[in-house]
Amino acid sequence: MKFDQKIPDKFLDLKLDEVFGNEKRRVLLAASTHPDEEKLIAGIFLKLVKEFPDLKFVEVPRHAERGSDVADIFNDMKLPFHQRSRGGKPSSPVSCLLADTTGEMVSFINESDIVIVGKSFAGNNEGQNVIEPALMGKAVIVGPQLKNFRHVMDIMLKKNALISVGDDELENSIRDLLKNPGKCKDQGAVAKATVFEHIGATQRTIDIVKQV
């Protein structure tokens, strides 16, 4: 039943050109991250952006109030970024946006090419909802265990609709998608098709119950 979700008809104008510049870009989104995941993923981004200069990074912590903590991590790593909760825009384009705000996740997913779903790396194994990015046709990467979404994960892994890797495999998984844009696009298409295949589970269950 967790497959039954709706995507809005319209998305927010995030004005990402004001942050990243207006050159062609590919966006890596770290969605709903928890402690220790931000450092792991930011470290990987710092390596990959040297190989792929068009790569941009959007970090959305699960709890917006952790924004200052994540900002400290990025500063310690010497990662130039713009912190969205502070408003305004950077004096010059940066390659990383710390989106410590609320109500914008779906719009950020819409702007992304690759989505890493948080609470599944760096010792976190409960997982977050993978349906939204999959339904929107994005290449979705998760950790090896999503205890809270095991049923959904099993279905999607069986269809190769998710990429499930450990911490030490995450960098190469992202690199592979960046090196092979066609594969990245195909991965998103499979994810979207798999979700659509299972949409309607709630209504079918209701219909079955009515017949009993």
Located regions from the model:
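Nucleotide-activated sugar donor-binding and catalytic core shared by glycosyltransferases
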Residues: M1-V212
